[in-house]
Amino acid sequence: QAAVRGLKALRDGKGIVFVKSAGNAFDSVGLSEDTSADCGVLAGAYGCVNSGNDTTNLEPNVIVTAALNAKGQAASYSSTGSVLWITGMGGEYASAGQYGEQSRLSAEQIAQGRAGDGPTIFSTDIRSCTEGYSRSDANPERTNAFMRGVSERVPGVKDNPDCDYSTMNGTSSAAPTISGVVALMLSANPALTWRDVRDILRQSARVVDEGYEKRTRSFRAPRQDKPHDGLFDLQANALLPQAADKSQIAPGATQVPVELGWQTNAAGYRYSNWYGFGVPDAAKAVELALLYKKEPARSRSAQQAVPEFTAVADLKGFEYQKVSLLGTFQGSGQTVDQFQVRLTGTELCLGSLGIAVESPSGTKSLLKMPLDHFAHPLRAVAAFTGYGLGSYAFHGENAQGTWKIYAVASNPRLNPADWSAADGWSTATTTCAAAPAEGATAPQATLQVQARVIAQ
């Protein structure tokens, strides 16, 4: 944290602009061709690995970037979370056709809901057709013609004869596209601080994929046949087809929404856990950079105070299988940049614990869903210290008033089992070691909750 915060003092006090990939773990960590060993039968319903799990991503001067595909939708792999700031271009896997423009999936597979193929970004590669990613000996069933050095737009003239160029995807591809927009902005106005750059990216961003929560987002296998605005049953650990909304995130609820879609907060900003504030318009961003040059009073200082956390709750015993109010936090009359929560627990199943926050203005944000990769037996966590989460969904709101922090807790006795089926999902379940033997109450569990508002 100290090193990342120290970046604010560089570039003659204007701060380094740090653009960072969100991650490629929507469905899984360590994905193999058609399987995942990480997030069980609900993989594909929501992000397997929260982008906020990387503590660097909680720092406001880190511009966390998601990936978009050629359809204008979230790339199948792009990690989600409430710390996303912006979305760049990442594409899919480009594994078929001359240039990756085709899908190698059959019509039947596509009809089943399979996805994860299609165009991607092109970049340079190690020279020669025997080194790097672009290779003449690549498997033609999994590699497009350009990547093998044999594609031709003009008969007899190969496009990539020396395999000097390759396809590139992932949020590692999306982040450089945002860096390119930033470079254009700084070329137009080198005096911009890191906060100016981040603000202009938000101001120039456009909403994409409106209503995405009403469809499915599958990967290479049809993980889910229910839309993302469905209900998650916290007792059965199952996704239900009924449409949900944020009002169902309330104390005592046993069913909660999986995804809230694009929300408009009290400051009038639109935000999404899939896209952050959206996709920036490079031309508009440059126009704004020039406006900041013409009107320097718009500029924000590169320095930003990060307050200490405030204790919110110190609980003995924990209730699973429902939504509970963990505690409240009193905000002062500041303008919110990011709201953060920090958790410390013992004898408590982190994979069964989700966190939601409600601002004094009534905006709600899902900071973490239960049944994520921490529920998997290979990554099960029952004791944790200083586990941090954050959200930009409240950005620009007045912090004055009472903030509510909710636990969204699933059934720890119905966690996903390790992958075992040869031809599909394993439906077996495991029990978290700290789960109560029966009922929903874990009297031995402890949970300390802290919160803070990082102001603009």
Where do the model's predicted regions map?
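C-terminal subdomain of the subtilisin-like protease fold in secreted/lumenal serine endopeptidases
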Residues: 1, 15, 61-62, 152-168, ...
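Substrate-binding/access-modulating region of protease and related hydrolase catalytic domains
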Residues: 1-59, 71-73, 158-177, 188, ...
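Solvent-exposed, polar/charged alpha-helical surfaces in well-ordered, non-transmembrane soluble domains
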Residues: 4, 8, 176-183, 195, ...
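Residue-level detector of buried hydrophobic side-chain packing
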Residues: 6, 65, 86, 172, ...
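Loop/turn elements at helix/coil->beta-strand transitions in domains of secreted/extracellular proteins
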Residues: 9-18, 59-64, 82-84, 193-194, ...
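Active-site-proximal beta-strand/loop segments in catalytic clefts of secreted hydrolases
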Residues: 20-25, 65-70, 80-81, 88-91, ...
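Extracellular S/T/G-rich loop segment that most often corresponds to the catalytic His/Ser-adjacent loop
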Residues: 45-183, 273
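Loop and turn regions of beta-sandwich accessory domains that flank beta-strands and are enriched
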Residues: 290-456
